[in-house]
Every structure is written in C-alpha cells, then in structure tokens.
Amino acid sequence: MTDYKNTLNLPETGFPMRGDLAKREPAMLQNWHDKKLYQKIREASKGKRSFILHDGPPYANGNIHLGHAVNHILKDIINKSKTAMGFDTPYVPGWDCHGLPIELKVEGLVGKPNENISASEFRQKCREYAKEQVDGQKADFMRLGILGDWDNPYLTMNFDTEAHIIRTLGKVIANGHLYKGSKPVHWCLDCGSSLAEAEVEYEDKVSPSIYVRFSAVDPVAVEAKFNAQGKGSGQISAVIWTTTPWTLPSNRAIALNSELEYQLVQFGDERVILATELVEAVQKVTGVEQVEVLGSAKGSDLELMRFNHPFYDFSVPFILGDHVTTDGGTGLVHTAPDHGLDDYIVGQKYKLEMAGLVANDGKFISTTPFFAGKGVFETNDLVLEKLKETGALLKLERIKHSYPHCWRHKTPIIFRATPQWFIGMETQGLRKQALGEIKRVRWIPSWGEARIDTMVANRPDWCISRQRTWGVPMTMFVHNETEQLHPRTLEILEEVAKRVEQAGIQAWWDLDPKEVLGEEDAKIYRKVPDTLDVWFDSGSTYASVVQQRPEFNGNSADMYLEGSDQHRGWFMSSLMLSTATDNKAPYNQVLTHGFTVDEKGRKMSKSLGNVIVPSEVWNKNGADILRLWVASTDYTGEIAVSHNILNSAGDTYRRIRNTARFLLANLNGFDPKRDLVKPEEMIALDRWAVSCALDAQNDIKEAYDNYQFHTVVQRLMRFCSIEMGSFYLDIIKDRQYTTKADSLARRSCQTALWHISEALVRWIAPILSFTADEIWGYLPQVEGRSEFVFTEEFYTDLFGLSESDKLDDNYWQKLLKVRAEVNRVLEQARNDKLIGAALEAKVTVYANDDIRPLLEQLGNELGFVLITSQAIVKPLAEADVAEGELAGLAVKVERADGEKCPRCWHYATDIGANAEHAEICGRCVENVVGEGETRNFA
C-alpha cells in the first residue's frame, strides 16, 4: 500500500499550541528592553500627529493592586492602538512622591522629625523610601507589558519637577488667585494637618443628637415680635439641634432663614421658637404632649434678637442665612464660625468672632472655660453634663449618621478654622472660567461632565497649605506684623526655584533669608513654614511635566485617564491650576473607569477573601490574560473579576491563539514575494474572506477610536469563531492539504491567510501584546518588515469585493445560513448513527426558487462548502423530507456513494480507475500526478 502522506500539504509551524505565557512573557520583556523597543516606536513615529496621554501619578507607596493594573493596561491599549492609527504617542509614566502616607511610613522606621531625627535627614529618608516604592511599582507595571519611558519617568520629587511646582505657585500668585485666611477646613487629628476634599471619606458614625435651649435675653421683646404679648407661660427659648456638642463652646449665633415662618409655641410648661414646618417633628422627638401655637413671625423680622449661650455668660444674636432649611432639626441653626463652612460664610457677613478654642492636636486651649485641655470628642459628654446642669438640654438621642473620616487613618475628622493659604474660587472669576472649560472637554463616559460640573460649582476655596515635613515648600516670605507677602515674592520664588532645581526642596529649608532678602528685609520678613497640598503637586504636572518634556513638543495633553474617584481628585486639581495659570483646561478628553469588584459586585477586601493580586495572575496565567480581561470588560461601570472570570478570559484567549496558529501553520512554505496571488485571480471564497477581514478591521478600528475595547474583543471573537473558525477555515482545509502545493487553488488560499494574518496580528497587538509579538516572529518574512509589530500601523492591503464579484457578501451570508442548516441535519444523522464524520454523507438539498440558484452557482464545489463527499441540489417541490429551520430548504442525508479515499478522506466512486494509483480517488490522482484540480469558487 502506497503512503500518500508526503503528497499532502500538512500544516506546520513552530508557533506553540499552548501559550505558556507565564513562562514566555519575561523573555519577551527582556528582548523589548535589550532592543530598546520604546525608543524604536518613537523613532518610527517621528513627524506624525501626536497623541499625548498624560499619566496620572500613582502614589509611591505599597505594591500595585488590581485597580492600578486596570488603569495602566487601559492607558497602554490606547497608546498602542493610537500608534497603529498613525499617531506619535510618547508615554511618560509618573509617580506622586510627597505627602503624609510616606511620612507615616518613614516615621515608623526612624521616628518623628525634630524629635528622633533632624528634619533634613527625615526628608532624605522619605526620598529614599519613595524611590524604593517607585522601583517596585515600576517593575510590576513593566511586567504587564506596558510600554513607556520607564528609564526616565517623572517623579514629583525630582528636583526639576519640584522647581516647576514652585513656579506654578508663582503663576497662581501672579494671577491673583492666592489669599491667606482663617477658614474652616477639614482637619485630621491624627495627621495634625488639614485635608483636601479628595482625602475625605464618609463613613457611618454614632453621635449624640441633641436639642438645646438658648433662653431669650428679652422675653417681652420676643412676645412682641410674635404678636403673642401675654400669651402662654414659662421660659422662652430658641431651640437648636446638633450632632456635635463639642462645637457649642464656639457658638456665636443662631441662624434662621429670612423666608421661613417661625412660631412661638407653648411646649409643655415652657415656650420655644421653632420653624413652623418642624413643630410637629420636634414634638414627636421630644415626646411633649401639650403644644399650642402662640404666634408666628417671618425669619427676617427676628434678625438680631439675642439669646443666652447655654453655659457661657454671654448672649448670641439671631442672624439670617440661605443655608438654613427645613430638611431636619428645628429650622434654627447653631452657628460656630470656626467649625463649619456655612457658619464661617454667614459669620463673615455679621462679623462674628472666630473663637479659636481648638488647637492643632484637637484639644481645647488652656483658656477655654470648663473644657481646657480636653479632646473634642471626649468633650461631647462633658458638654452634655454641662447642658443638663444648666437646664439647657431639651432632648438627647444617639444616632448613626454619615460623617467625614480621614482616608488614611479611617478616623473621624473635624472642621476647624486655622490660618491657611487658599486658592479663591471666586477671585478673578476662577469658578466661572473652570465651569466654561469643562464644557470644552470630551468626557468619557459622558456623565462625567455633569459630575465634575456639580463639584466645581459647589466646591469651597481650595486650601493648598499643609503643615508637613515631606512636601514642596510654599517658598514665600510674609511680614512679621502685617502677614503680607514680600513685594518681590515672584522674583524670590524664581530665585528659590533655581536653587531647588539644583539641590531639591532641602535648598529652601537650608536657605538663609538674607541671601534673597538682604539684611534689612530679613529682619522683618519670615519664611512661610507650610508645604503644598500633594494635590497641588500632581495637579500641576500639566506644567511641570507636559510643558517641560521635549517629547511632548510643547503640546498639551490629549487625554487624562483615571478611576472615577478622580473627578474630585486629580481631574479637579489639574483643572483648577491650569485654569488659574493658563486660562484653559489641561486636557482635551477625560476618560474614567470604575472600580474592581468581585463577581457578586462586592469590593475587594481581605476579610471577604476576594482580593486578587496582579502578580498572582501573571505568574499563573500570564499578563496577556489580565490584559484581555481588562479589554473584555465595559470599564465605564464596576469591573467584575474573579478566578472564574479570568478563566473565561483564558477560553477567549485560546480561541484567538488557535486561530492564529491555524493561519501560521497553513502559511508553511508561502513566500509572499513569490507566491502572492492578485485579488482578481483569487478564488471567490478567498476574496470574500479577505473582504470579511476588511469589514472586521473597520469595526475594530472604530471601536479602538471610541475606546470601546470590549467591542474590539467581541468583534474579534465573531471574526475568529464565526466567519473564520466555523466557516472559512473549515472549508479550506481540503484545498490547503490536498491540492498541488504550488497550485492557484492553494496559493489563492494562502494569499488570503497571509492578508488575514497580517491584519489580525495588528488588531490584537494593543491588547494581547505578548502574543502579538510572538505571532509576528512566526509570520513569513518580507523585505523591509519592522522588527516589532508595535511600530506598525493597521494593515492597509486588505480589499473588499469588487462590483464585478457575482458572489458578493450577501451571497456568502446566505450560504452561511444554508450551511448551518445542513450541519444541523448532519448532526441529527450522526446522532441516529447513520453517519460518523460529515464526509461519510451525501446530502440532497431541496431549495426554493430563491435559494436554489445560489447553490447551483457553485456546481460540483458545493460539496466542498458543505464538507460532504457529495452534494446534490434539487427543487423544493421534489423533496421527500420536511423543511427544516431555514425556510425554503429541506435537507436529506444518506450514506455517501463509493469508498473512502485514504488521501483526502472523501468518498468517491472512481477509486481504482487509475491502475497506477488504484487506492486513491480520481481527484487525488489529478492532484498527485496530473495538472491539479481546478477550483473557481471554494
């Protein structure tokens, strides 16, 4: 028996079936590093349109978590897809390196500055610690396959960056946005410092809920205002409600709404003043049964009436404020200008005293009656005792409510007035201009615009000063008596910035004021001891990084991309500073993604045991699986992840890899320069396959352009699984394996596979970067080919069907449906044990007048499309079987005629017709020793 195996064109490739990504990826990374891949991309992109995705700096503390991985993978997908679209996409990764978390870590190692170690040594230790953290995170980001200038990242602690942060402060001052004020700010007792809006979290807290009496100084005058002379009996009191009893020592007024109606009410054996709308609610809370309205008055008529403080020997006025509502409480608001923003604002209007009773450590100062030296929260109970003692406590409850907490310490914070430096939202029209700039930016998803618009519209002035050791100093001098900035402040800032550029921020702390002020001014001006809020550091990177790095060529950022929490963080601080200094937003587009949750929608937490660490994934599955999971998910909402979800991503990966392997294996022996077939000479099915790839590419490019990466993956899977896997690649196996190696039938097919491979590898490169790099190395080599797929643009040699193609896309789509119906009937026959493999079948397709001409066009090649040994087409009227699931079609399956050919596995009736090759069918004889069979369609 002759062995015809060596007459077949069997698929062959060194491209492995298994990805083994965890093992192979590190070697690829090393190759990228050794070959300077990032620099090669920059060189290949010179002169092209730029696209700048500016990296929001992660904080240089701790290992990267899954959220970091999601963020940087999304950025990398965008940069690589933009490169493939013909853009120059320089990417400079960065890190946020100053601030309290690093201070706390270093304190744990070496102790507090100025206690266990000098401040200058402490700063150096902070710098060293931050550098270690950056190096660790950098290695992790690189392991994810993210390309960027990792050798030259930006760090906010780089000397030149620190200098430019100081210069940005100078611009803020020059444009009139900075002022000093004693204003209530979020204050963390554990940090010993003010907090930015973005550093505040809200958690549930149990607090005392109290109703407090302020007795009237002149009860007769009160009766007159309410037109209730001589009515009722007992003491007259204004009743306030609060959940912060410790702020009562700082009370300096009671606020009413000028438009609300208030009533004087007989409340048991006393008389109280309440907002009309809240009388019933307060009665219910206090349990007072006897209630009678004695008179009413408008808030505006009660202004400046005075009431006695509940335990101090002074009285406070009624004042009017728009912030007073009837959403809860009594409609009369306890006002302590030191401890609330609304209180402060209305207090400024009425020139109320700022009591200043609470020190930096959260304890009452030594001159505070009754509470000196006590912490604010322990004072709550002491105040309650005092209120009971004076008879001022009307009602006490305990409630659970949402309360601001420090994001680092997870402890309750307070509002506290301290002397701080602010960027004014109303000065020079900053708020109005920022709101206008928001409208100019493209927000992705679109709801981001309304979110940041509301935040900017309602945000307070930005407190940019901090009382910390490790931070960029506010390099200013103020007058010892007037507290005014030195008249040469801008000049001094630039002089100090130059020194910082050479020696870092320590240059400021080491600076003798006489060096920049002269002998006389140094006597009357002192250094500002504060450092800048770290949000100022990162918020000014549009100036300290984007405007400085040569690869950006002076262009502003096209995109900022971070988690959705950054509307109130980095997006906000960047917008405020850029508008204040440059009169424009620092970005053209802002894209946000959601947070990672488990498959049940729960946050990642150690206590739930659902935390997935990125390194565990790449060590087990490979970084490409992590990248594919990120790309497959709609990042605009919460991003679900679990081991099951990652396994599903692995299944998707295998489908793509198997498709690539089939393509590569069947390009064995193909030399594009020698063997490429012109489109007009290609077989109809092959031309259609290339046109399918063109359609897929157009969809994929559009999805990349719209940052819809899950759509890219879905379209890719449709192409690999439906159009290719279950149709085209299945059909061509016979032609690939059995026709003459150099025949038009085979070379036409290989030409299609070549074009498809060249396109496919570019489609997946932004997402499956390691796998694309691997595929690139196994593709048939052509002259002038780039060493790496990442320097290439999307493939441009795909082509669509021409108008002269009778078998257009509509034709092949109908044929796909016919084939699906035939496969359904074949599967039934297989289940009925009539046949085993499809090639054991002869099918008779009974078709109506619409479908039959389509099938008849293929002639004897219909069997190759249906992958049956014989296929006959007859009118539907002749059918002796019922119509199936496709209207107008009935399919009859019988055992194929003839014997099985050992070479092509088709059943044929002409086996033995050729004496020299009696074992194989006539078609195989033609392909082995003749001119080779002719194919026109499939």
Swiss-Prot record:
Reactions catalysed according to its record: tRNA(Ile) + L-isoleucine + ATP = L-isoleucyl-tRNA(Ile) + AMP + diphosphate
Written domain comment of the UniProt record: IleRS has two distinct active sites: one for aminoacylation and one for editing. The misactivated valine is translocated from the active site to the editing site, which sterically excludes the correctly activated isoleucine. The single editing site contains two valyl binding pockets, one specific for each substrate (Val-AMP or Val-tRNA(Ile)).
CDD domains, alphabetized: Anticodon_Ia_Ile_BEm (cd07960), IleRS_core (cd00818)
Role description: Catalyzes the attachment of isoleucine to tRNA(Ile). As IleRS can inadvertently accommodate and process structurally similar amino acids such as valine, to avoid such errors it has two additional distinct tRNA(Ile)-dependent editing activities. One activity is designated as 'pretransfer' editing and involves the hydrolysis of activated Val-AMP. The other activity is designated 'posttransfer' editing and involves deacylation of mischarged Val-tRNA(Ile).
Identification of the protein by name: Isoleucine--tRNA ligase
Organism for this UniProt entry: Glaesserella parasuis serovar 5 (strain SH0165)
Gene from which this protein is expressed: ileS
GO CC entries: cytosol
One GO MF term attached to the UniProt entry: isoleucine-tRNA ligase activity
